[in-house]
């Protein structure tokens, strides 16, 4: 039984002529005469896809596109999984450092807030809108860019959004009031968000399920590295702060060239190009070729991520969890200056350099990935060769405790009476716990929604960044009205409640996936494995 038939059979879709299905030969699995829409989907029924219907779009809608995307065979010779290692590493490296470049703006700007207050006569809360609206842009941008990359391809979404990101650096560099700065920061954040949703998707495109943990760890490393080095960069350019945005334009131009040089990673685009050369006919190629209508594609792009967020309990739960976790990190970062400048009498550059403990922490997370990958393969063997998405959390069952532990450690050793080294190391512990959780969640989502990963990650990102944007402003109130010790301790107590979520997903995630329309169920994975559709370890 093919993977499409397996998936469809668990979403009220009956396969046709299964007994007569030809053996796998390395080609795309599903042929046109094997697709029949169930009564549940009769409103857009298309039992056959003849060449006469090639130009028609009446029978193709956003759900048809989603099903076609989910039917891609990972063993197809044109699939990026078959690329040589050097090609995969080149693409992964370019996109990882693209993410570093975009994310550093989220923390670099905090050094300029007192300049905004002095020049534009605003309060500190208002000046923080530049940061929080950039994060809001990061939240909503993927809701459009993620689904666009799932249907039009990753490469040109990167290039187009990056060019627009560069353009909106100009009004920030020339800003003459705070509204101009904040609004353009939000727009730039939206276009730059392709480095969030789409980089993770690209890693899933090129790496197999057994090695994708490494690719996603690079994605997580890029996000945390960018946030870590952004603040020192901003401090270094403090006296010439407008040059930060001119520098962003120069560096961005370099990345545009690299993105143009990178090959397309979306499997369906590669397979369609292969099919146009060889004349191969498959269901997914026919469906996607028919979907030339701008209306159909626009419906897919605009509806898919929101549909996933509103109807998929996995994405909703993990998105809300990560929103609080990500927000707690911004609250923690709000506390670094009161701790290291006020309590330890460091200079501002010294305090900014303490952000680098997160860079050390996330580098340790990358180094832990061989252990997590071994545990993942061990769990797969233990379950008869069937991979469980929940196995992505195995190492996180331990490291999740680093989150509250790091916050408690920081809280009660940061009052200035104990060496500054202690809270610095505590921040490093937090820098291991938080990125490892994010890594596990991204892996889990991409395993559960493999061929609409861009849309799934976009849906996951929205609540994550929206909540974080609100908590940025809450941090100012907390540290103005509480001591640094009890402000940090409050964050630590809140983080304890988040630990349970990881255990719930690990032990009960397979039950949640059973009630999903798009997530791959464990039974579907088992049947696909039995049919030898999925690659062996």
Swiss-Prot record:
Residues 31-46 have a biased composition (Basic and acidic residues). This is Uncharacterized transporter C965.13. One of its GO terms (molecular function) is pyridoxamine transmembrane transporter activity. Residues 10-56 are annotated as: Disordered. It holds the Pfam family MFS_1. Disulfide bonds: none annotated. GO terms for cellular component: cell division site; cell tip; endoplasmic reticulum; Golgi apparatus; plasma membrane. Its main location: endoplasmic reticulum. It is a multi-pass membrane protein. It is found in: Endoplasmic reticulum; Golgi apparatus; Membrane. SUPFAM superfamilies: MFS general substrate transporter (SSF103473). It comes from Schizosaccharomyces pombe (strain 972 / ATCC 24843). Keywords: Endoplasmic reticulum, Golgi apparatus, Membrane, Transmembrane, Transmembrane helix, Transport. One of its GO terms (biological process) is pyridoxal transmembrane transport.
